[in-house]
Amino acid sequence: ITSGKLPAAATGSVTVKLNTSMVMLPKEPMQPRLADERVGFFQNPVTEFSDEQQVTSRGAIIQRYRLEPKDPERYRRGQLTEPKRPIVYYIDPATPKKWIPYLKAGVNDWNVAFEAAGFKNAIIAKEWPDDPTMSLDDARYSVLRYLPSETENAYGPRIVDPRSGEIMESHICWYHNVMNLLKKWYMVQCGPLDKRAQSM
């Protein structure tokens, strides 16, 4: 906050608004899944202790959403079923209106992957409701956050149950200029095959 081009660099001080949000963990933890370095997942490190050890052992479990079928029998037969609790991402109301349909489509396109795993309507994008009791900083709501900044980047912090790796909530934060970064990547990576990329 006190370096670079940020306002605090000139004044030497800044006022910061902080938010703390606490949520109860599920009474029954989700079944954890051990991490495999051959597959790319974010991980929770685990240190194991037991009476039989002379030294602790280390491992990791993957971070993932808890998707449970509403109709287990249908799911076991290999038929698509909706989850008990779908993954819902809200669109930050500060998002430029032009991009909202594309962000919603990008989230909803993930349903193709979830259908391959047996779930339909597993992930949903919604516009932020006009509800004064809801807060973008509330740990109960996953949000696609828009950050009006010249930074060319995006990131995705998550709140995860440390016992199981269950993702309780996630924010996908994208800076305004991330589109310029994507354009550069596309030009470099696809330029040899896509003539449109050669003239970007």
Give the role of each language-model region.
Residues 123-127:
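A short glycine-rich, hydrophobically flanked beta-strand micro-motif that places a catalytic Asp/Glu
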Residues 1-95, 113, 117, 128-200:
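Auxiliary tRNA-acceptor-end handling modules of aminoacyl-tRNA synthetases
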Residues 94-122:
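Zn2+-dependent metallopeptidase catalytic core
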